[in-house]
Amino acid sequence: MANSKEVKSFLWTQALRRELGQYCSTVKSSIIKDAQSLLHSLDFSEVSNIQRLMRKDKRNDSDLKRLRDLNQAVFNLVELKSTQQKNVLRVGKLTSDDLLVLAADLDRLKNKVMRTERPQTLGVYMGNLTNQQLDQRKRLLDMIGISNARNAPRPGADGVVRVWDVKDSSLLNNQFGTMPSLTLACMSKQGQYELNDVVQSLTDLGLVYAAKYPNAMDLEKLTQAHPVLSIIDVSKSSINVSGYNFSLSAAVKAGACMLDGGNMLETLKVTPQNLEDILASMLKVKRAHSMFVSDTPGDRNPYENLLYKVCLSGNGWPYIACRTSLTGRAWDNTVVDLGPPIDLSQNKQMSPAKPKGAGHGMPSGLTMSQILALKDLMAAVDPNAKTWIDIEGRAEDPVEIAFYQPQTGAYIHFYREPTDAKQFKQDSKYSHGIDIGDLFNVQPGLTSAVLELLPPNMVLTCQGSEDIRRLLDSQGRKDIKLIDVLMSKSEARKFEDEVWDKFGFLCKIHTGHVVEKKKRGNKEEITPHCALLDCLMYEAASTGRFSPGSIRAVLPRDMVFRAVTEKVAL
């Protein structure tokens, strides 16, 4: 019967807002403070890596560990957290009828969530089947008399089923929720916008949400006034996409928290003292508007969503706080008990780490001692060995250059601060994802010095030679020859995930959100391009295998980056 009922989604949301408004609070300043802490101290190169891992067809225990480690880093940097709390509901503020309804709803919600998040059943293969393969598999199973292919997992928008292949699936719990502070920080850092611009844009989105659920058309109109909103991807699923995504739902949640004095459910705060009052108010609205828990797998309706979040942790902000440290699910942490009272245990909150300050030095060229040291270092380059070269940026304004010799494992990798900031921002959005602020401390003059010290008449291998040829010619190195392997884009990037998994730690500045333009104005999120890792994957693609050996940097870090000292106020 529940399936035949109509979910009046926004009407339910408004009704719950009105009834629970007294438990809501203004959280804007706290969220902005947490966002600033994340901007100052979170490793956004690892954020970019996690976003890449979440696009993989199949993710394993190693990927999950990286996600959990980054989630823990976020937890340590923010103040808005949910604390582990065992909620035991008894007759008192809640009647026995209330408790029976809550117990039934939690049980029904448990069944729905388990079917949605873990759709596999006995005999269903949870692998990387494309949409076409799934259809063929269904026909074959029907032909031999097995008709349970309908239980196969649903493919994503690109036709590929994405699954977690992990030993302990309980470790996935509470690792995927979005947080407004994290959404603000990622939009600012990876979109390369001022935090204030992000706040203003999400405030407008929140104002729309006060009257209706924002959709793609609303977002498109708002983007005209707030370009930062172009980073939002309306095609993103809301299930198992991690808190580092740019989905519309994540942005709407953040926008709701930017409204001062509102009664938005997102700003609800639950404590052990008001938990039963909140649940009683929820049941009152449920009865008045005939709300229910649906048996159909998929996204939760407003009542289901609120019930799950409130019962997951009875101490904190159920919608917006970091809950990565929580264990169990809503039905584990909130139970109905008609027995005598018992003491409730409560874990202590972890203290947030303080963001480290940073300072900027003034740029200077290579000193004589640096030039002499560079000459000695460049002597390690084998003039006769196969050598890959790749650059990011424009030939006349490169921002990253890498050389790699597969035979010895030696590589040269350095950066350059751009002169055309406007063009750099465009290239960052559609190619390399570098934040210009991360290039302020690179060593100036290194590009010309390294190119000048390359052995004469050297042969370099590349994927696309036009920009590289122009760069070499501009530095007077017309003697250097180029071999362009001319692979297709898909061929060249065949081993992209393997290379990033193994060597992603070598480069930490590709932190931005990068998209690729598609037909009819569409766009697709892609992994940022890194000159060094591109060289490694081009070598793997050209040989047809990825056989990672040991690699070593020719240039030490203090040659690539200038020393930075903090100024002391006198």
Curated annotation (Swiss-Prot):
Could you tell me the keywords of this UniProt record?
A: Capsid protein, Helical capsid protein, Host cytoplasm, Host-virus interaction, Hydrolase, Inhibition of host IKBKE by virus, Inhibition of host innate immune response by virus, Inhibition of host RLR pathway by virus, Interferon antiviral system evasion, Manganese, Metal-binding, Ribonucleoprotein, RNA-binding, Viral immunoevasion, Viral nucleoprotein, Virion, Zinc
List the residue ranges of the region (Disordered). Answer: 342-361
Q: Which residues bind Mn(2+)?
A: 390, 392, 534
Q: Which top-rank group of organisms is this from?
A: Viruses
Q: Does the keyword Metal-binding apply?
A: yes
Major location category of this protein: virion
Enzyme class, top EC level, equals hydrolase
Binding of Zn(2+) occurs at: 400, 507, 510, 530
Q: Name one GO molecular function term.
A: metal ion binding
Can you supply a Gene Ontology BP term from the record? RNA-templated viral transcription
Important for exonuclease activity (site feature) positions: 467
Output a single Gene Ontology CC term carried by this record. helical viral capsid
E.C. numbers: 3.1.13.-
The UniProt entry, under InterPro entries, shows:
Nucleocapsid_arenaviridae, Nucleocapsid_C_arenaviridae, Nucleocapsid_C_sf, Nucleocapsid_N_arenaviridae
Tell me one Pfam family matched here: Arena_nucleocap
Question: Where found in the cell?
Answer: Virion; Host cytoplasm
- Please list where the region (Binding site for the cap structure m7GTP) is annotated: 54-241
Which comment does the entry carry about domains? The N-terminal region is important for the cap-binding activity while the C-terminal region contains the 3'-5' exoribonuclease activity. A CCHE zinc binding site is present in the C-terminal region and may thus contribute to the substrate binding and/or the specificity of the exonuclease activity.
HAMAP family per UniProt: ARENA_NCAP
Family assignment? Belongs to the arenaviridae nucleocapsid protein family.
Q: How does it assemble?
A: Homomultimerizes to form the nucleocapsid. Binds to viral genomic RNA. Interacts with glycoprotein G2. Interacts with protein Z; this interaction probably directs the encapsidated genome to budding sites. Interacts with protein L; this interaction does not interfere with Z-L interaction. Interacts with host IKBKE (via Protein kinase domain); the interaction inhibits IKBKE kinase activity.
Functional note: Encapsidates the genome, protecting it from nucleases. The encapsidated genomic RNA is termed the nucleocapsid (NC). Serves as template for viral transcription and replication. The increased presence of protein N in host cell does not seem to trigger the switch from transcription to replication as observed in other negative strain RNA viruses.
Q: What is this protein called?
A: Nucleoprotein
Source organism (scientific name): Ippy mammarenavirus (isolate Rat/Central African Republic/Dak An B 188 d/1970)
Lineage of the native species? Viruses, Riboviria, Orthornavirae, Negarnaviricota, Polyploviricotina
Gene it is expressed from: N
